[in-house]
Amino acid sequence: MRIAGIDIGSRSMELVVREPDSASGWTTTVQRRLPTTFDPVRQCRLLLEDCMPDRIVATGYGRALVQDMDLGVPVETVTEIRAHALGACHHFPQARTVLDIGGQDTKAIALLPGGKVGRFEMNDRCAAGTGKFLEYTATVFQMDVASFGAYAMLGTEAPVINSMCTVFAETEATSLMAQGVKPENIALGLHQSIVRRTVNMLRRVGLEFPLVFAGGVANNPCIRDLLARELGADSGSLLIPDEPDMGGALGAALWGATSLG
């Protein structure tokens, strides 16, 4: 029995395939990622190429698309909140809170004993505080988002960025440049604005440590550093998976295995 978890997000889609293993129960045999693009159905078929499972569990914005694709195997769905909670707890069973910052949304999840979901909050109505915010504002500095975090870490004094609207934040950054503020300091201020918003979300759901930080934005070194400092968290209380953007797909696959009984 091969179970695939697919997480179809607005920016990318991830696949995790798990199979029974005599030593450990289940093991991950496939991990893949593709951009979602404007044709998510085609991309999903490419993602599954040469590894068609016996069962699929889909999560993310596009999970309903997978059910309509006539893939010839049973397909079910699981909510993003539950999938990300399962993925985080698989890596870190001691986790008490999960923060997932993706391309278009931010999820803060408080966990109950046993990894069950307690309170949660999700910002999915605008790009503020998400990977899209970083991607958009990075263009002001004429650089790609992959380099933006390291550049922001060169800053020494972060100006306060008051607007969390992506468009207005770009205008504010441009205005600060015109005032002679160092670009690397502005970049640091933009990162700090995300962290402030995120920490407020975490506190509203009832932050407890250890905190698992996942999602594509967890790859940003500046966000990681600022979040740890803002929370006063050490390496034992702020936990980051080796592949932080695979958590949703992993959680979906885990859900599929669990629901088999």
Show the residue positions of the predicted features.
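Short glycine-aspartate micro-motif
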Residues: 3-7, 55-58, 96-99
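Glycine-rich phosphate-binding loop plus the immediately following alpha-helix
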Residues: 116-157, 162, 254, 258
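Glycine-rich phosphate-binding/hydrolytic loop that grips phosphoryl groups
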Residues: 86, 131-135, 239-261
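Glycine-rich phosphate-binding loops at beta-strand->alpha-helix junctions
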Residues: 61-62, 207-230, 244-245
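Short glycine-rich, Thr/Ser-proximal phosphate-binding strand/loop in the N-terminal lobe
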Residues: 2-46, 117-126
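Conserved phosphate-binding catalytic cores of ATP/NTP-utilizing and phosphoryl-transfer enzymes
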Residues: 44-46, 66-102, 107-115, 119, ...
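Conserved phosphate-binding/catalytic loops in two-lobed NTP-binding clefts
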Residues: 74-81, 227-250
